[in-house]
């Protein structure tokens, strides 16, 4: 059995790490490179860096941040936000990232998934899914809809359909974020996570809502996630990655030991 991965997520805006609740009221919490180094030294398995306004602002990729991170940490990291073309993917990977995450761009142009997988390998392509709970309908039978542009734009895409389609197109991994749970620290959306994790054959990273180590244990066991994204619970010093991993190990969840 593969070890479950613990992945800090750094939302970046104008070159600074920020954190909000449900993608709103973001506050500055530090330099992304310094924070990346700290989490690397703490025992993170990977790190995710998202430029949270690059797509909505139609800006370029934060390549300067990517290059500085690559010189500082020695674990895999992925980059998302503002990646719209194969050239963007190539630039990010050449700057030092192991993976690229596409979200809004993939909804608008699904072929970018297959093109990226063919050019760089599926292992490099992460589909970011921002999901909101809605009333089930003929169009969205799962009751979960894909939203883009930082949660501001609905798509009419059913989350389960989109996950299966992305897998078919060649995505190597899914990062599944619940907009409803994001930043609340009330726990992950377990039903959503289990629905996607048990329907696709590629790894699923659960995102949105982590507040305690118990929440991670729940999403990794009950939600069947392969990895858990964390932000607020470590950004504000409430828990350390070492403490989280020790808790998971004590509760029978296999993790990479870094203590």
UniProtKB/Swiss-Prot annotation:
It holds the Pfam family His_biosynth. GO terms for biological process: L-histidine biosynthetic process. InterPro entries: Aldolase_TIM (IPR013785), His_biosynth (IPR006062), HisF (IPR004651), IGPS_HisA/HisF (IPR050064), RibuloseP-bd_barrel (IPR011060). Its EC number is 4.3.2.10. Its main location: cytoplasm. It catalyses: 5-[(5-phospho-1-deoxy-D-ribulos-1-ylimino)methylamino]-1-(5-phospho-beta-D-ribosyl)imidazole-4-carboxamide + L-glutamine = D-erythro-1-(imidazol-4-yl)glycerol 3-phosphate + 5-amino-1-(5-phospho-beta-D-ribosyl)imidazole-4-carboxamide + L-glutamate + H(+). Keywords: Amino-acid biosynthesis, Cytoplasm, Histidine biosynthesis, Lyase. Pathway: Amino-acid biosynthesis; L-histidine biosynthesis; L-histidine from 5-phospho-alpha-D-ribose 1-diphosphate: step 5/9. GO terms for cellular component: cytoplasm. The active site is at 11, 130. It is found in: Cytoplasm. It comes from the Bacteria. GO terms for molecular function: imidazoleglycerol-phosphate synthase activity; lyase activity. PANTHER family: IMIDAZOLE GLYCEROL PHOSPHATE SYNTHASE HISHF (PTHR21235:SF2), IMIDAZOLE GLYCEROL PHOSPHATE SYNTHASE SUBUNIT HISF/H IGP SYNTHASE SUBUNIT HISF/H (PTHR21235). Heterodimer of HisH and HisF. IGPS catalyzes the conversion of PRFAR and glutamine to IGP, AICAR and glutamate. The HisF subunit catalyzes the cyclization activity that produces IGP and AICAR from PRFAR using the ammonia provided by the HisH subunit. HAMAP family: HisF. Belongs to the HisA/HisF family. This is Imidazole glycerol phosphate synthase subunit HisF. It comes from Syntrophobacter fumaroxidans (strain DSM 10017 / MPOB). The gene is hisF.
